[in-house]
Curated annotation (Swiss-Prot):
One of the GO biological process terms: abscisic acid-activated signaling pathway
The encoding gene: PCKR3
Name this protein carries in UniProt: Probable intracellular pathogenesis-related protein T1
Organism: Catharanthus roseus (Madagascar periwinkle)
Induction: By cytokinin treatment.
Note: Related to intracellular pathogenesis-related (IPR) plant proteins and to other allergen families but has no allergenic properties.
List of glycosylated residues: N79, N117
Keywords attached to this entry: Glycoprotein, Pathogenesis-related protein, Plant defense
CDD domains reported in the protein's UniProt record: Bet_v1-like (cd07816)
A single GO molecular function term of this UniProt record: abscisic acid binding
GO cellular component, one term: cytoplasm
Length: 157
């Protein structure tokens, strides 16, 4: 099995608490407002939003795939960290066993920084498509920036 992992840091003018609330805690109701052409809805299939929760994300016509299922592995509100994996859906292209994400939001200078780690686990003998991985990285950064812009435009969302 092959593994590719990448880290990225995205700076935000929002406070760490506000970005964590918007991008992690309220993402189910906020993301489709911030990216209406990309994400149609986020539905909780099981759980209360914390560890063990299963979410079904429905993408719109501008989305990368029709839908994916997320399994929440960890939600730490005190440390503003969130860990989840894609467990089902078209994002798990042939040869890809799983995708895991770790998000940690920290205070920084005049706002915050979102530290985002993504790990792709490939089945043995499968080819790695670097272009698709790069596109996924760009989409993640765009989502964070879209949530930031929405909250700035709608501070009382």
């Amino acid at each position: 099995m092959g593994v590719i992992s990448y880290d990225m840091e995205i700076k935000s003018s929002l406070s760490a608490a506000k970005l964590f609330k918007a991008f992690v805690l309220d993402v189910g109701t906020l993301i489709n407002k911030a990216l209406p052409n990309v994400i149609k809805s986020v539905e909780i299939l099981q759980g209360d939003g914390g560890a063990g929760t299963i979410k079904l994300v429905h993408f719109g016509e501008g989305g990368p795939v029709p839908s994916v299922k997320h399994h929440v592995e960890e939600l730490d509100k005190d440390n503003m960290s969130y860990k989840y994996s894609i467990v089902d859906g078209e994002a798990l292209m042939p040869g890809l066993q799983s995708i895991s994400y770790v998000i940690k939001i920290e205070p920084s200078g005049h706002g915050s920084v979102c530290k985002h780690n993504t790990t792709f686990h490939f089945k043995a003998g499968s080819n790695i498509n670097e272009d698709e991985i790069k596109a996924g990285k760009e989409r993640a950064a765009e989502m964070i920036k879209a949530v930031e812009a929405y909250v700035q435009a709608n501070p009382d969302y």
